[in-house]
A protein has these predicted regions:
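Extended catalytic core of nucleotide-activated donor transferases of GT-like folds
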Residues: 45-139, 255
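N-terminal pre-catalytic "stem/leader" segment of glycosyltransferase-like enzymes
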Residues: 1-73
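A short, well-ordered alpha-helix in the C-terminal region of glycosyltransferases
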Residues: 340, 347-361
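Conserved donor-binding/catalytic core segment of Leloir-type glycosyltransferases
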Residues: 6, 173-189, 195-198, 210-212
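Acidic anion/phosphate-binding donor-loop and adjacent secondary structure
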Residues: 136, 152-170
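Aromatic "clamp/platform" in nucleotide-sugar-dependent glycosyltransferases that forms part
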Residues: 271
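Nucleotide-activated donor-binding/catalytic signature segment of Leloir-type glycosyltransferases, i.e.
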Residues: 222-254
Length: 393
């Protein structure tokens, strides 16, 4: 019997949950024996507006053409890209969420005092071992907590030297050493640490530039960055500001890939992350990485291309007034790693090439979607009933 899969999520919105849902759906089309349907979830705020141009045009046509569930469609599995423990009408349900501080929001708990109360038909899908701990602590049985990482599109996210040089020229950074970070500029991203570390290395590296990419359409990224700069000591702010470039507009997948290619070094000194997809994407482009050690990125980085910042566990206040887990990266160690990268420019380019090969072998969307299918349809896979279409030729 073919597997029937209902995916519930968002389309054509520049949010990580939407990007992941759509990327998986594109890859799921390879499976001739999965009947795939897509149901749009309402947006959490009227400020969100759909827009095209995020994915490649051919991919967006395929996403738009995903059929909704017809009358009488009874899924074997429902994959919902929203934290919700309510049971499905039929079959099994996998609820996707990324509790970045390893504590579940009141909305996700939605009346359940512990995981022991969550119906057995409800499973959890989450992208890292770090976030999985949040569900295990809540009491969800380990056999119903499934870790499937995110992936990259190798058509776009791979080393491309000609493109790298062109984008650097367009950005006016042809001769600079470009240190880059991408994210919402929220408190968990560690942008204050990055600014302070950059101030420390700025005088000794006159060609270093710090390039930050925010998301002004979904978050107050520019305002947060401005407040963070204002909070710096005046001497540090004077060193950083002339060397800092900020870009907040929405990018398509192709534009984002080009932007990442322009970097010499990608830095993510985060305090708490559910996954941190830009780290994976930068590495896929051949950019060496510095990121917080001990967190979600440990799952998909390797010492051959990523330097991990020493960190210590901390407690973090949540937006809903609770307490969760975080990591405090060591500022001195981050500064030391930045100086090492600046002093070893050819060596870190070789690290970047190693990282691109490592990611391409393990973390394409097709590869991680195959892992997803094994989790969603474990019973059917055991019987050998499911499999992707054979490649043409």
């Amino acid at each position: 019997m073919p597997g029937k899969l209902l995916v519930q999520g968002w389309r054509f919105i520049h949010h990580s949950y939407a990007l992941v849902a759509q990327a998986h759906c594109l890859s799921l089309r390879r499976y001739a024996d999965i009947a795939l349907r897509f149901e749009d979830l309402p947006f959490p705020t009227t400020a969100w507006q759909q827009s095209r141009g995020i994915f490649l045009a051919s991919d967006e046509e395929a996403i738009a053409a995903l059929p909704p569930p017809e009358t009488g469609f009874v899924p074997d599995v429902t994959l919902q890209f929203k934290g919700d423990f309510s049971p499905p009408p039929a079959g099994r349900k996998f609820t996707f969420d990324t509790p970045e501080v390893r504590a579940l929001t009141p909305e996700a708990r939605r009346g359940f005092a512990s995981g022991a109360e969550v119906p057995e038909s409800v499973h959890v899908l989450t992208p890292s071992r770090w976030t999985a701990q949040g569900y295990l602590r809540f009491g969800i049985p380990a056999e119903r907590v499934h870790v499937v990482p995110h992936g990259v599109d190798p058509r776009l996210l791979r080393p491309q030297e000609e493109r790298r040089l062109r984008v650097r020229r367009e950005l006016g950074l042809a001769d600079a050493f470009v240190i880059m970070s991408v994210g919402a500029m929220t408190g968990n991203k560690g942008i204050d640490l990055l600014l302070r570390a950059f101030a420390r290395i700025a005088e000794g590296a006159p060609d270093a530039r710090l390039v930050l990419k925010g998301a002004d359409d979904l978050y107050a990224s520019r305002e947060f960055l401005r407040a963070t700069l204002d909070a710096l000591p005046a001497a540090e702010r004077t060193l950083v500001t002339p060397r800092l470039a900020y870009i907040g507009e929405r990018f398509s997948a192709r534009q984002m890939a080009g932007f990442l290619h322009a970097a010499d070094l990608y830095v993510a000194p985060y305090l708490a992350e559910g996954f941190n997809l830009p780290v994976l994407e930068a590495a896929a482009c051949g950019v060496p990485v510095i990121c917080t050690g001990g967190g979600s990125t440990d799952d998909f980085t390797d010492p051959s291309f990523a330097w991990r910042i020493r960190s210590q566990p901390i407690q973090m206040r949540t937006q809903w007034g609770g307490v969760g887990d975080g990591l405090l990266p060591d500022l001195d160690h981050l500064t030391e790693l930045l100086r090492s990268a600046l002093a070893q420019r050819e060596q870190i380019r070789a690290m970047g090439a190693a990282g691109a090969a490592w990611i391409a072998q393990r973390f394409t969307w097709d590869a991680v979607t195959d892992r997803l299918v094994r989790e969603l349809f474990a019973d059917a896979r055991a019987g050998g009933e499911l499999g992707p279409r054979p490649s043409p030729g």
